[in-house]
């Protein structure tokens, strides 16, 4: 059995991939382009990938290919019609990053809400050493307890965030982007009500026709002026140009983004024009990537392979 890992770099250089060798001969590539892919998968029985396209252009010569393991939940890189026609099984992974993403959500919130960038700079640039006062209250902050935390998309991650927000003493409300979700533990509201009532809005929804550009200049105008927006869902749910406008015009107090419409960020992104604005926090799609989450992910991929080889259907999407 020949296994090919096409994008090991996307799992992190600190991860141990030796466990895959129990399934057969393993070839590891740090990264793979579409042009490089056909030759690399030509003799593979199992391909492990993340973002590189799996389609006729990359797979047409892979006559032995039986299984594609995607190291993510989304399978947008898979040509489903092609793999079905060629009887190639596909698995994904889910649930591995719930704790990590929830943790990062609150890290980003507190970074903005407690003005940590400003106060860290205040100490390190010498202003505190030059002060005659033992403290600094230039940028007042408020307590999270008693605030309303609005969640867009109450899946596993959304529910984890909700439970943590409750532990901080927040009232939690949520908006179901599909309209089908109903959770008795939390108050469900429409989008307008969520934006009007929430001091914090965090996005944990998938990208689809209903959510693309959901947050735009019109919806920002419905938010509280002191509200903070956090997007750890999908980048294109937030219109980034409109977000910059909303921040400049004071429609909202701050925004934190871990996902962007284009990743890596484009050099001409309007967000980069606000790089020195401490009301905006951007991280490079790292919310999912705690060491524990990546270790769980690798374990799930190995479990998927073992299940497939034993005739099982663990995490099969095709």
Predicted regions and their residues:
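N-terminal glycine-/charge-rich "phosphate-binding" loop or analogous flexible N-terminal tail
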Residues: 1-44
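Rossmann-like dinucleotide/phosphate-binding beta-alpha-beta segment
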Residues: 135-225
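An anion/phosphate-binding loop that grips the pyrophosphate of nucleotide cofactors and donors
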Residues: 44, 62, 197-198, 226
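Short beta->alpha connector loops at strand-helix junctions that form conserved
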Residues: 30, 71-72, 88-99, 176, ...
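Rossmann-fold NAD(P) dinucleotide-binding segment
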Residues: 53-65, 80-82, 210-229
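Rossmann-like dinucleotide-binding domain for NAD(H)/NADP(H)
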Residues: 226, 232-318
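Structural alpha-helical scaffold elements that stabilize or flank donor/cofactor-binding regions
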Residues: 20, 39-40, 58-61, 193-194, ...
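Phosphate-binding beta-alpha-beta segment of Rossmann-like dinucleotide-binding domains, i.e.
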Residues: 94-148
């Amino acid at each position: 059995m020949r296994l090919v890992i096409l994008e090991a770099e996307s799992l992190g250089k600190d991860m141990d991939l030796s466990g895959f060798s129990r399934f057969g001969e393993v070839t590891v590539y740090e990264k793979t382009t579409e042009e490089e892919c056909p030759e690399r998968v030509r003799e593979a029985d199992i391909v492990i990938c993340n973002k590189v396209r799996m389609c006729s252009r990359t797979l047409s010569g892979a006559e032995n290919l039986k299984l594609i393991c995607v190291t993510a939940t989304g399978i947008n890189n898979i040509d489903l019609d092609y793999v079905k026609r060629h009887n190639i099984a596909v698995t994904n992974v889910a649930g591995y990053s719930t704790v990590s993403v929830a943790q990062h959500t609150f890290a980003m919130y507190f970074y903005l809400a407690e003005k940590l960038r400003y106060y860290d700079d205040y100490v390190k640039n010498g202003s505190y050493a030059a002060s005659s006062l033992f403290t600094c209250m230039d940028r007042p902050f408020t307590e999270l307890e008693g605030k309303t935390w609005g969640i867009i998309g109450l899946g596993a991650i959304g529910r984890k965030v909700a439970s943590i927000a409750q532990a901080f003493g927040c009232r939690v409300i949520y908006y179901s982007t599909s309209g089908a979700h109903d959770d008795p533990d939390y108050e469900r509201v429409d989008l307008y009500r969520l934006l009007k009532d929430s001091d914090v809005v965090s996005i944990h929804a998938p990208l689809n026709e209903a959510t693309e550009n959901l947050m735009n200049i019109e919806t920002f105008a419905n938010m509280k002026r002191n509200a903070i927006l956090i997007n750890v869902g999908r980048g294109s749910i937030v219109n980034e140009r409109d977000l910059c406008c909303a921040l400049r015009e004071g429609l909202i107090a701050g925004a934190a983004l871990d996902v962007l419409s284009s990743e890596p960020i484009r050099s001409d992104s309007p967000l980069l024009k606000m790089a020195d604005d401490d009301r905006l926090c951007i991280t490079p799609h790292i919310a999912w990537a705690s060491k524990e989450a990546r270790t769980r992910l690798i374990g799930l991929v190995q479990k998927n392979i073992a299940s497939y080889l034993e005739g099982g259907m663990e995490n099969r999407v095709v």
